[in-house]
């Protein structure tokens, strides 16, 4: 019980508010980006012709994924000074959902955009004209989302996450969000995320030769490279410093 804790090793309240403020700025920027793509997608003006080549619908979905991640990451730093134990427990259960759905949206949509280019240029080489509708592109996104949703449902049903307080020493406790087999479930989730980002990277590499003004391939490859690099460093450190709440939050938050 939180009321019995003499000293809680929690994320610093100042650090939480700082990261929340940064996340809110990111959310506002993504909302503005969504508004821009909505205008571009619905406008008949030739000014937005180049933007329409970028598939505004899927750019919007990517921005939505980013917003979900931006909302989820600061909430990982909730502590007893800013939230009740019930709220923290709810966030504990929601966190895998939010991050996995955000990940699935971002990288399945980037893969879908590249798959569209692969199909178009493959047909063009045979002198065939082809159009790929948004509905056809959603056939790439939907299975990815379904896989992650089914996984999270199984995790909740079989081995639900709980917020627990563990002793750091005789007078200090820290809270952890875990289940009986957290490492197994987290390992599978990381594996699914790695598989999705690998597919996204392979699709982008297939389009490497396409000029930058027709494709975001090089940008996608840079995003994938940076994501993999940061993840490979952050995830091991996150589990090594289990008792250092603020340090773990700084590692994951950015």
Summary of predicted features, one role per range:
Residues 2-254:
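Alpha-helical multi-pass membrane domain signature
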